[in-house]
Amino acid sequence: MGDEKDSWKVKTLDEILQEKKRRKEQEEKAEIKRLKNSDDRDSKRDSLEEGELRDHCMEITIRNSPYRREDSMEDRGEEDDSLAIKPPQQMSRKEKVHHRKDEKRKEKWKHARVKEREHERRKRHREEQDKARREWERQKRREMAREHSRRERDRLEQLERKRERERKMREQQKEQREQKERERRAEERRKEREARREVSAHHRTMREDYSDKVKASHWSRSPPRPPRERFELGDGRKPGEARPAPAQKPAQLKEEKMEERDLLSDLQDISDSERKTSSAESSSAESGSGSEEEEEEEEEEEEEGSTSEESEEEEEEEEEEEEETGSNSEEASEQSAEEVSEEEMSEDEERENENHLLVVPESRFDRDSGESEEAEEEVGEGTPQSSALTEGDYVPDSPALLPIELKQELPKYLPALQGCRSVEEFQCLNRIEEGTYGVVYRAKDKKTDEIVALKRLKMEKEKEGFPITSLREINTILKAQHPNIVTVREIVVGSNMDKIYIVMNYVEHDLKSLMETMKQPFLPGEVKTLMIQLLRGVKHLHDNWILHRDLKTSNLLLSHAGILKVGDFGLAREYGSPLKAYTPVVVTQWYRAPELLLGAKEYSTAVDMWSVGCIFGELLTQKPLFPGNSEIDQINKVFKELGTPSEKIWPGYSELPVVKKMTFSEHPYNNLRKRFGALLSDQGFDLMNKFLTYFPGRRISAEDGLKHEYFRETPLPIDPSMFPTWPAKSEQQRVKRGTSPRPPEGGLGYSQLGDDDLKETGFHLTTTNQGASAAGPGFSLKF
């Protein structure tokens, strides 16, 4: 627009007129020329050419056309006027202002359009760059992910190969150990069989010699009778009298008797070696050296699979012993028949034979009882008839030459307990805890100075025999050996049958007393570690068809190494399929499952899993989850937290005995999530709900609990060795503290725990006037 303004030029009037005149002249010349040309065309068209005919229609049309030449001239004149240069018109100020505004607006709009196009171009450029950058980053992430997955896959493959190699190596070592153990046991059995055969052959030879001697004495009884009587009365031959000829045979019999005693001592050594292998830890503590027997005993503890082989070998030994016992009993019966058939036997010889019986090795317990017999025989060798056998002291038919004589008195311990150590070999330090069916003490082995836990079994009615509860506890705890279950070392006895103790490895803490002294609760990683160990122990019990039936925090032990162990098997028992009716009065009240509270008599492993859920909540909050004051209050507390069950969520709920008799208040909602809040994640709360499911058939098992995602999310479980340590309460002065309610007891007439501690037998606390122990710290033993 600026260029157009600059090209304008103001013309004068003369210039305008001249320009107009010049244009007019040009137009006239052009018109004249056009008319001339048109006349020439008309003249040419008026005269027909040769052979051309006139078209009247066309002529008429042209002549009568509305477009005349004058009109065309006028139109051309108007066009010429529009093309003519006119003088510039004067613009007013207002028009000029408006014109400038329009120009500015157009310029601004044009500039805005240019700026917008530039902005869009830059925006498209940035978007293309961002897209390219994102694509590059995405590609980079894909490559990094592929690289990471490849490295992780390689690492896992290496780890798997390493584990496979270790597993194969362990299997090879295990096979080698089993092979060595089998060879050793086979060698021991072979030696034992050879010894038994030698003893039985020796006994058979002695019986034959004795029968021959009896027959000979029957047919020629009168001649040698007076000298024997004179010798017994002290009127025998003189000191200088010659020794009679038959003295060689009794000397030979005496040598055979000494050989028999040596063979019996060898048998006793073999039985002692078997007892040592059965109590591996005690024998290793006594030896103190790395002998082969100690290594074999430790291997036996680690190998749980070898128990089946040992049981088979023991069955074979028992069968062999029964066969030999049968053969020996047959021989003894034949011998007795021969003795009865001798009608002419003298009355003196019959009285002698009535007091003496032949020894027949029947079982290991008989061989164990032979120790006391052999000791008394050695004591009796100082008598003239046994030890003072000189050349001048010959007795023809002395009873001392007969086979070994059985003692009429019982040994100090019963045969079933032969080989058990005495409790006197332990120094009791202090009392730790009262269990379901006994009292636990902390003691020290006097030989090895090891600290152990001694649990005295509660003998409910010892006059009626060994109590079934104690027998069940010993059998269960010996069967369920596992790293997360208390380890039994041996069984020791006191002076009487009512004093039987289980020797266990000493563990420093129980979770109940530990949580009461802790200033801060367990960390989430520590709770996961404890729960994993608890579930492993419970899984091992359930895999071996064992119900614990008394899981609670006071029965869970924690060592300084962070290893959790399940203890107190006083209420444990084996179960089978199909389920049988058991007593519902089991499990401590706070940890008792709802089916037990409502009177169900058929139950299974689900009762232990409910207790595990209660322990889980107590580990998180350091408080019992359902601390009821009575069974009814316990049921109400459970229903208030979890909601009242119905037949829909618990099939068979309405058929339970307590539900038929009572009506409970309705609690429609589960309020358990509010109780834990931030202490428990969503996965943890899901696991808690599965532990505390009403219907036992839907309650989670220990095996499935170990596979739950709660143990794989962050924070992960910590290593047990990273657990903090606390001072052991059992090693300090015992203080009274709040405990969970007592478990169900053994019924009417069941004596209170710890009553025997006040008697003169068993453990007794003896102190001086100043309060110090009279015989060192702790308890002293009295019997």
From Swiss-Prot:
Anything else known: Duplicated gene. CDK11A and CDK11B encode almost identical protein kinases of 110 kDa that contain at their C-termini the open reading frame of a smaller 58 kDa isoform which is expressed following IRES-mediated alternative initiation of translation.
Protein name in UniProt: Cyclin-dependent kinase 11A
Biased composition range(s): Low complexity: 279-290
Residue ranges of every copy of the Protein kinase domain listed in the record: 427-647
Biased composition (Basic and acidic residues): 18-58, 126-215, 226-241, 252-264
Cross-referenced PANTHER family: CELL DIVISION PROTEIN KINASE, CYCLIN-DEPENDENT KINASE 11A-RELATED
Residues with PTM Phosphotyrosine: 582
Up-regulation conditions: The p58 isoform is specifically induced in G2/M phase of the cell cycle.
InterPro entries: CDK, CDK11/PITSLRE_STKc, Kinase-like_dom_sf, Prot_kinase_dom, Ser/Thr_kinase_AS
Post-translational modification as stated in the protein's UniProt record: During apoptosis, induced by Fas or tumor necrosis factor, specific CKD11 p110 isoforms are cleaved by caspases to produce a protein (p110C) that contains the C-terminal kinase domain of the CDK11 proteins.
Control of this protein's activity: Phosphorylation at Thr-436 or Tyr-437 inactivates the enzyme, while phosphorylation at Thr-583 activates it.
Origin species: Homo sapiens (Human)
Molecular function GO labels: ATP binding; cyclin-dependent protein serine/threonine kinase activity; protein kinase activity; protein serine kinase activity; protein serine/threonine kinase activity
Assembly description: The cleaved p110 isoform, p110C, binds to the serine/threonine kinase PAK1. The p58 isoform but not the p110 isoform or p110C interacts with CCND3. The p110 isoforms are found in large molecular weight complexes containing CCNL1 and SFRS7.
